[in-house]
UniProtKB/Swiss-Prot annotation:
Tetradecanoate binds at Y142. Adopts an immunoglobulin-like beta-sandwich fold forming a hydrophobic cavity that capture N-terminally myristoylated target peptides. Phe residues within the hydrophobic beta sandwich are required for myristate binding. The modification N-acetylserine is found at S2. Gene3D superfamilies: GMP phosphodiesterase, delta subunit. PANTHER family: PROTEIN UNC-119 HOMOLOG B, RETINAL PROTEIN 4. This is Protein unc-119 homolog B. One of its GO terms (biological process) is cilium assembly. Found in a complex with ARL3, RP2 and UNC119B; RP2 induces hydrolysis of GTP ARL3 in the complex, leading to the release of UNC119B. Interacts with NPHP3 (when myristoylated). Interacts with CYS1 (when myristoylated). Interacts with MACIR; interaction only takes place when UNC119B is not liganded with myristoylated proteins. Belongs to the PDE6D/unc-119 family. Its main location: other.
Length: 251
């Protein structure tokens, strides 16, 4: 996963088990999943508090709360250093199993990863022994070529499974930062997922236009571009994934 297609306009690599991240969704039926195409929150009416309008909050203030809601993370002014929830808060057993990124204009697949099957994981654990990293699966590191920063729309397809509980109002908020500057906020509704289902969604990233100076700095400073992906069920934070990015691949 280190830019295996040298002819691609922008290649990517990932290190680590892979916290999966994303944008607009297309759900298609797979093992009981829901078939639907959902748009990002833009003009849809919603409560004013959900806009994140108000004084900025700190990570420490959110960690002190019993329940973290969408309006809280929308008021963060910088990327988090810690996880805002525990793995065991995912009481719905939502598990991301496959991830693919493609350039929507050309259809070129830039990156693809799949989670090992259960038998492979058990074999690795037996061979490795020792303590299990509780953050495994919550962080991913990407390396793209500089050309990635000039793409306009990228599709990120994710496949995920749901446990034996129904999942209602499943929502993701993903915030991308370069250093202390918020580049883009993505906000998407997955809607309802039936129990014991396998769901596939394509999230469409519409990237902001960046100045040449910002692009140069992002290329020259790998992994200073970072993101938080917050997942909510019924407006309660249940999962938090993190990622960082380099844009100097192939150099």
């Amino acid at each position: 996963m280190s830019g295996s297609n040298p002819k691609a306009a922008a290649a990517a690599s990932a290190a680590g088990p892979g916290g999966l991240v994303a944008g607009k969704e297309e759900k298609k039926k797979a093992g009981g999943g829901v078939l639907n195409r959902l748009k990002a929150r833009r003009q849809a009416p919603h409560h004013a508090a959900d806009d994140g309008v108000g004084a900025a909050v700190t990570e420490q203030e959110l960690l002190a709360l019993d329940t973290i809601r969408p309006e809280h993370v929308l008021r963060l002014s910088r990327v988090t250093e810690n996880y805002l929830c525990k793995p065991e808060d995912n009481i719905y057993s939502i598990d991301f199993t496959r991830f693919k990124i493609r350039d929507l204009e050309t259809g070129t697949v830039l990156f693809e990863i799949a989670k090992p099957c259960v038998s492979d994981q058990e074999e690795d654990e037996e061979e490795g022994g020792g303590d299990v990293d509780i953050s495994a699966g919550r962080f991913v590191r990407y390396q793209f070529t500089p050309a990635f920063l000039r793409l306009r729309t990228v599709g990120a397809t994710v496949e995920f499974t749901v446990g034996d509980k129904p999942v209602s109002n499943f929502r993701m908020i993903e915030r991308h930062y370069f250093r202390e500057h918020l580049l883009k906020n993505f906000d998407f509704d997955f809607g309802f997922c039936i129990p014991s289902s396998r769901n596939t969604c394509e999230h469409i990233y519409e990237f902001p236009q960046l100045s040449e100076d910002v692009i140069r700095l992002m290329i020259e400073n790998p992994y200073e571009t970072r993101s938080d992906s917050f997942y909510f069920v019924d407006n309660k934070l249940i999962m938090h994934n993190k990622a960082d990015y380099a844009y100097n691949g192939g150099q």
